[in-house]
Amino acid sequence: MATFVMFGKYSVDAVKDISAERTQDATAVIGDAGGQVQAAYALLGETDLVLVVDFPGVNQAMQASVKLAQLLGISFTTSPAVTVEEFDDLVG
């Protein structure tokens, strides 16, 4: 599994529908794409949400990102991530 960080931004309409049920819906979309949420945070500022998610690969991360936008009205910027230790091994 590969780790991805998903940065979410609510649309005006999506803010009106925030609920624990929608959080469960988002988790289900990620699971349906083969992913697993490792951590989720609500933020203040330009980014409203950050999710740390494991997916089998880029295709599944992209699939979940698009489906989340379609279902919830939250746009995501999704980036692959590696630990600092993995990064050091890659560049060292």
Task: Go through the PLM ranges and name each one.
Residues 1-32, 36, 44-47, 84-92:
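Short S/T/G/P-rich N-terminal loop/turn motif that feeds into the first structured element of a domain
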Residues 5-9, 41-64:
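Short, well-ordered beta-strand segments in beta-rich or mixed alpha/beta enzyme
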Residues 13, 51, 77:
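Short, flexible active-site loop motifs that bind/organize anionic cofactors or intermediates
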Residues 37-40, 76-78:
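Generic structural signal for residues in well-ordered beta-strands
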Residues 55-82:
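An amphipathic, aromatic/His-enriched active-site/gating alpha helix that lines ligand/cofactor pockets
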